[in-house]
Amino acid sequence: MKALSKLKAEEGIWMTDVPVPELGHNDLLIKIRKTAICGTDVHIYNWDEWSQKTIPVPMVVGHEYVGEVVGIGQEVKGFKIGDRVSGEGHITCGHCRNCRGGRTHLCRNTIGVGVNRPGCFAEYLVIPAFNAFKIPDNISDDLAAIFDPFGNAVHTALSFDLVGEDVLVSGAGPIGIMAAAVAKHVGARNVVITDVNEYRLELARKMGITRAVNVAKENLNDVMAELGMTEGFDVGLEMSGAPPAFRTMLDTMNHGGRIAMLGIPPSDMSIDWTKVIFKGLFIKGIYGREMFETWYKMAALIQSGLDLSPIITHRFSIDDFQKGFDAMRSGQSGKVILSWD
């Protein structure tokens, strides 16, 4: 079958032929319809330090997808041939304390699809049936293909009660923009997103965010005054991994504020811890999605009117995958969809 693989320990991703994966007793075989390029895939393409330490070569990459069930393992219940599915990209062990306690998103033995085992940038994918999620009929293939990153956004945004709250989102990448849109959709008062990438800030404006702020040109305190905010942000969603952005968030949080962190800062990032302590801030780390509570919330948010369509900016045939990666690497894109049909 046709697949996109990391074939060499250098920059790039290559089209290749690989065997169709074998179906296990507890697995589904999925014929891929559409995939989306994740920032993780760009890291793998660039062959950065993280990728060099993490990705075995060769490896079929990709973990954002929608497809159709074409094979069912003999022990699988609850699925039928033709079901349209996406899937949780974190394969968990099932036997650690967190898995047995129902906190599977915190499994210490997690394996990543397209990272530690063959991924979805291929004509066919095999995953455990436990990881598959049926897509409702009224959700498009394009939106289903981005459920994985949308899940990161939903998990982060819904970590805290947002109704009537003032929310700061630092980092206007696709996940940050979707998190901001979720916050607005569920009843936050003011949702402010910050970045220095004007293209992506404009995408955020199309999603109905209260204010998209280019911090290279505007002062966040001035924006807060303009919005009538006198006490700081109640909730912070840190999506950038940029130390200056996180420090600004700490400066502008209200006392007792709550912060969810999805962005990955450098290991040597320094902050003024007195602001965390004396403001009584709560900081929560976010990894992946809650299985599968986040997935049900994702579907319900879209079905209740949340419009994510502006975040998808580019669509290509899989044969033009290089154009898709070029768009993602340029920083002048939202989500990029690759069609396998």
UniProtKB/Swiss-Prot annotation:
GO terms for cellular component: cytoplasm; cytosol. Pathway: Amino-acid degradation; L-threonine degradation via oxydo-reductase pathway; glycine from L-threonine: step 1/2. GO terms for molecular function: cadmium ion binding; ferrous iron binding; L-threonine 3-dehydrogenase activity; manganese ion binding; oxidoreductase activity; zinc ion binding. Transmembrane segments: none annotated. Its main location: cytoplasm. One of its GO terms (biological process) is L-threonine catabolic process to glycine. Keywords: Cobalt, Cytoplasm, Metal-binding, NAD, Oxidoreductase, Zinc. Homotetramer. Belongs to the zinc-containing alcohol dehydrogenase family. This is L-threonine 3-dehydrogenase.
